[in-house]
């Protein structure tokens, strides 16, 4: 699984010019799913997103508070293109991403893990063409990756 995490002042996602998910201060997560992702990766990454200290504390000291500490909001958007491989040719190959049916199940599990936090969690529409508007704060953008361990 790959996640592009962005600290945001606000963010929203639209499908056919209708907003389907929007948040104020918090995190926008662009999530790519691989066919080997297991519950262990999902839980680890959900916990990492919830626990990372990316926000200032009430005194303004940077990197002191997590999304949970500030009771922020999270927008989760599926993005299979994170597994795009551009090493050959002029078109990316997406063979490293999970097939849509499998990816949707894994994505929904990941969202469910985040929802256990009690924070406001909004999502895009899985598999749809979406427009995402992000007001990046900082900017703070991180790439989180966790692949299944070989058996």
Swiss-Prot record:
InterPro entries: Daa-tRNA_deacyls_DTD, DTD-like_sf. One of its GO terms (cellular component) is cytoplasm. SUPFAM superfamilies: DTD-like. Its EC number is 3.1.1.96. An aminoacyl-tRNA editing enzyme that deacylates mischarged D-aminoacyl-tRNAs. Also deacylates mischarged glycyl-tRNA(Ala), protecting cells against glycine mischarging by AlaRS. Acts via tRNA-based rather than protein-based catalysis; rejects L-amino acids rather than detecting D-amino acids in the active site. By recycling D-aminoacyl-tRNA to D-amino acids and free tRNA molecules, this enzyme counteracts the toxicity associated with the formation of D-aminoacyl-tRNA entities in vivo and helps enforce protein L-homochirality. It is found in: Cytoplasm. It catalyses: glycyl-tRNA(Ala) + H2O = tRNA(Ala) + glycine + H(+); a D-aminoacyl-tRNA + H2O = a tRNA + a D-alpha-amino acid + H(+). GO terms for biological process: D-amino acid catabolic process. Belongs to the DTD family. A motif (Gly-cisPro motif, important for rejection of L-amino acids) lies at residues 138-139. The keyword Iron-sulfur does not apply. It is an enzyme of class 3 (hydrolase). Its main location: cytoplasm. One of its GO terms (molecular function) is D-tyrosyl-tRNA(Tyr) deacylase activity. NCBIfam families: D-aminoacyl-tRNA deacylase (TIGR00256). It holds the Pfam family Tyr_Deacylase. Homodimer. A Gly-cisPro motif from one monomer fits into the active site of the other monomer to allow specific chiral rejection of L-amino acids. Keywords: Cytoplasm, Hydrolase, RNA-binding, tRNA-binding. Gene3D superfamilies: D-tyrosyl-tRNA(Tyr) deacylase. This is D-aminoacyl-tRNA deacylase.
């Amino acid at each position: 699984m790959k996640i592009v995490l962005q600290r945001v002042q606000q963010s929203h996602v639209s499908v056919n010019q209708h907003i389907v998910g929007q948040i104020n201060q918090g995190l926008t997560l662009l999530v790519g799913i691989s066919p080997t992702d297991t519950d262990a990766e999902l839980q680890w990454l959900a916990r990492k997103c919830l626990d990372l200290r990316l926000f200032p504390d009430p005194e303004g000291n940077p990197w002191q508070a997590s999304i949970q500490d500030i009771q922020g909001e999270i927008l989760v958007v599926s993005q299979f293109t994170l597994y795009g491989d551009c090493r050959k040719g002029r078109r990316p190959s997406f063979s490293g991403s999970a097939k849509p049916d499998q990816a949707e199940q894994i994505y929904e599990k990941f969202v469910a893990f985040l929802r256990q936090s009690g924070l406001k969690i909004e999502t895009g529409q899985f598999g749809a063409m979406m427009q995402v508007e992000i007001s990046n704060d900082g900017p703070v953008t991180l790439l989180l990756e966790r692949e299944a361990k070989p058996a």
